[in-house]
Amino acid sequence: LGKMGIPAHAISRTGYFSTQEIQVLLNYLAILDNPRQDIPLASVLTSWFGGLGEEELGYLRAVDKEKPFYENVLAWMSESEEISESISEELRQKLPEEIQEKLARFHQTYQKLRKKSRYLPIHELLYEIFAMTGYLDYVTALPAGGQRRANVEMLIEKAIAFENSSYRGLFHFIRYIEKLQKYDVDFGEAEIVSENDEAVRIMSIHKSKGLEFPICFVA
């Protein structure tokens, strides 16, 4: 329908956590809490945040195959604002300069955000991520950008609701999301179509009970 220029919206109670824009954002939050995680770290580095391609990621992995992937990355992400002086010249020569520059840019933003993550409420941390990386503008510019943006903004709402409970902090929020995923407690994607919008609404027969439509296709 989208390819034909027909506005359409699928109503679902699942699929929120599997959307790319949310997966990447949750992975970024995860490594802000703890960067020693190979899969979330690789996901973030090959996303808008890191800008690395798969081949470049392979170069980074090959720097020292005896160590976990995250250790190779952390060698370039010391607590200082500059790239760690402990990196040997041999390691520098193994990694192309373009990759080093991308890691340096990623490292600079990451370190600032990680410091903020220690005291900011989650929803404010998300706003900081968007302001410093342009992530919200990026997802909005993608195909189906309106839906993607609404999904990201929905995560802010979830963060605010979480902070109104008895728990606080990034660590607890990540554990909360992980528990939802573990027990298959998912959300549908954010609603961006109102009842008065002219668009095709895709839903189950059960969901359509009690509603009236001038035209209906059953498939």
Whereabouts are the PLM-identified features?
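Accessory alpha-helical DNA-binding modules that contact the DNA backbone or grooves
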Residues: 63-90, 103-106
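Conserved motor-region signature of P-loop NTPase helicases/translocases
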Residues: 1-63, 94, 100-101, 108, ...
